[in-house]
Amino acid sequence: MLQTEMKVIQQTEIADKVYELILTGECVAGMSPGQFLMLKPSRSDLLMRRPISICSYDKTAKTCILLYRVEGDGTRDFSKLSEGDTIDVLGPLGKGFDIDTTPAPKTALLIGGGIGVPPMYQLGKELAEKGVQVMFVNGFQSAKDSFYAQEMAEYGTVHIATVDGSLGTQGFVTDITKNFPEEPDVIYSCGPKAMLQAVKASFPETKTYLSLEERMACGIGACYACVCPKADDTNKQFKVCEDGPVFRADEVKL
């Protein structure tokens, strides 16, 4: 983990209020799929850092891509960044996805919902490079919210569900996965809690890893703002930022 400044290479709005931010910096060397960065807004009245998941990285070029949706003052501040600007970053943080499971999977199902889609990209890329057959299932509210289908298609098959039916299957990600003829060897998922609950319930016998989305204040486990109950003892809790954000589905109570 480093507290450092990263330089903006490029920023583009790629969907409705969703931005692709390309950064460069030394901290890229320590990144792994499923981790996140804590970004500090430039405005002096915005004291808290914002957690942004890592979409992809290139360790040789020392660049990474973050995808985020503008939802408040902090992310609105980030959306004003342009080429050559710098941003104060803490990271990479958290425990990411386990891609070295034993036995090695032949098939992997990657399920993302909304702004939970970005971490699926680098994960799918690295799994595909290991020879795993990758299936992406992405869920969005509408076609205008959809992104990265073309990029993901380089590493696996892509299925899209939209609530309003404007793109792909009308409904939710589970309306797609319930029609798959065979269960995958492993499932990785990131998105809203309701979606993760549905994924967990749909595949009770499949090895499943869930990346939890929680509001975070410190990002390093000091403030207990992002706790999640343990499945085996509801009196004990995980700190999502430090113990996760990725957990086995059987570890957590959603």
Swiss-Prot record:
FAD binds at residues 50-53, 67-69, 74-75. Residues 1-99 form the FAD-binding FR-type domain. One of its GO terms (molecular function) is electron transfer activity. InterPro entries: Cyt_c3_hydrogenase_gsu, Dihydroorotate_DH_ele_sf, Dihydroorotate_DH_Fe-S-bd, Dihydroorotate_DHASE_ETsu, FAD-bd_FR_type, FNR_nucleotide-bd, OxRdtase_FAD/NAD-bd, PyrK_electron_transfer. This is Dihydroorotate dehydrogenase B (NAD(+)), electron transfer subunit. Binds 1 [2Fe-2S] cluster per subunit. Belongs to the PyrK family. It comes from Listeria monocytogenes serovar 1/2a (strain ATCC BAA-679 / EGD-e). The keyword Iron-sulfur applies. It comes from the Bacteria. [2Fe-2S] cluster binds at residues 218, 223, 226, 241.
